[in-house]
Amino acid sequence: VSQKEKFIHALGQTNKEHFAMTCKDADVILVIGTLPSRNDAVLAQEIEACVDSGTKLIYLFTMEDPKLSSKSAFFSRYEVGSEEGVFALLAKSFLLHVKLPERLKTYFEELDEGYVSAESNIGEEEIEEIEAICSNATNILLVLGEDLMSHPCATQIANFAGLIANHASNVSLYVVGARQDDLRTATPNETMHEIDNIPSFDGVVVYQCPMVQDTEAQLLMGSPQFQMAARVQNNETINVTINQEVYRRTFVRDDSLKGVIALMPCDKASAVYPYHVAKIVKAEQ
């Protein structure tokens, strides 16, 4: 069973109609857990076209997407690794005025919002912004990215997303990379675990992402802020150590990037969560 199949199963959708294969019918698109300009150029174009014809875009990610951030009605950055917490907050917000089973109601009442907000960087203000944009929407599309499927807490993330679509009448799900025949109904799991240890990625972080051009396989691309944090020079040959493995790369400063996460293009997607705390040193010539 692939990661994607497991994730779709954990969404626990009671009705196939809750799945969407296109963004076209949505009046609000909420994208989370993907960098479309890198991971899915077709999706990025489709979202851009929707926004140009009046759809509102909410974009939540660990960094800005050069194509989508400027098109967003609201963009907010969450901390690497905190996706489960972000979904707990979104689910609580979306289901606030919905009649829920007692067990779920209690779960959301007891959710430690202070802790989750502090660790994820998505607080009350961000949730209020999202609520304001969604308040009059008749069709909200929740775009679930590949980061969510490879996350150690993928099952519970899918459970939260699934709860939203099963209980909120105006939300449908778009699973990035899924084909029509991947989308299946399943029994919902409505027993949630407490969120009490959101991981922290302290230090220099790299994001392994697909290559857009073949030449990128040798590069590590980062913003001016990343360059300062990692103490590297533009066009310098460096060794990037991730879990004891050393990758020789050339650092390239990219002024279109923001934040302190560098992009590490790879030729094939791996099934592990794509963020890594890395050690970066200048390579011996």
Give the label of every model feature segment:
Residues S2-C23:
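Glycine-rich oxoanion-binding loops at beta->alpha junctions
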Residues N15, L43, E126-I127:
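Amphipathic coiled-coil/heptad-repeat helices and related helical stalk/stem segments
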Residues S2-E5, V80-F87, Q180-L183, L257:
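A short acidic, often aromatic-flanked loop/helix-cap motif at beta-alpha or helix-coil junctions
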Residues T138-G145:
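A structured phosphate/pyrophosphate-recognition subdomain
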Residues V51-T138:
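Long, well-ordered, tryptophan-enriched scaffold segments
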Residues H18-V31, L35-K71, V143, S150-Q285:
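A cross-kingdom feature strongest in bacterial/archaeal respiratory oxidoreductases
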Residues G12, D40, G123-E124:
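A conditional alpha-helix N-cap/helix-loop micro-motif detector
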Residues Q3-K6, I29-T34, G114-Y115:
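Short, basic, glycine/proline-bearing loop/turn elements
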